[in-house]
């Protein structure tokens, strides 16, 4: 269980899996059999069946059992005792052989142990809180990866459709130029230029199809099944979660990010462990009692022994174990404190990175949309100019390429903005199953 928490925290403070995947997705977007698929309904399946989340839930169950186990020393002990054997007693010159039998009931209740027992319970409860926060971090990591996979499918599909349309348009234009050359209205150079662009368009389509199929395979690995159709993501469902400013987001993240909450709980739990470390040197008070019956003893029949008492134990020397254990715990606390400092910096870094990408893609969407409109107008003008002999075939081909580039850039900017939107929520620690409308199985 502890190893699981450490693994997630180490991964987070070294950059975070979800942030690396997010940056990778943005790079892909900017550079390069089922029912209709609604992302939120598809995420429900991931939330229910993902093995990493399942392991986190198992760790939480183990931590809950640890809390119960920590309370056992607060409970009384009650047990049955008994023994039977052979004995010989010599008295007045006679030997007496007999088989004494002893049985009874005993109990013990610890009343005080220097506060170590209560510290043990509090430490277990805090450890449970840490594991629960760690599970929240795991859930958000997995859900962010799943969302990125869904967005990449949408982006790859849109780019594929644009390339297919471009191939169709250039194919028609190539046929037009070739026919014009047959009647002497264009040159073989024009035909060669149109043919070259058509071949590049075909390559662009093949590459876009490959990127789409790769995105589908990533989706299949994460989600299990691939829907027949992917529906665009409805951000209105989670729009209210988005912060007003990066300052508000940072303040919220530093209070609520699950990795920070897990580390905070671990630090407090470790401080409780100092009291536990001194357990072997702390005084203890027990209440003990017993009722015993002894039979088969010569001259003594039906012996009943009842006793109850308070037992005080004050250790004087334990070979230095308590102090060594306490020093080890203090060193562990210092290490956790350094992890908290680093984790806080990582939270702020990841949040600012996601926020900056979101803001830049807001601008990119508007800029690329304006570029699309301008390139459409430019293409119409170039085509008209060619019809009147003022523009060449190469001018038209270049205008077609500019229009395709701006359309692809606009598509990628839209999907990069959606990815950044969810990355901001994840960096805040707010990409929870509840906020996404998911229900625990």
Model-derived segments and their meaning:
Residues 12, 36, 409-441:
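Acidic, low-complexity, intrinsically disordered peripheral segments
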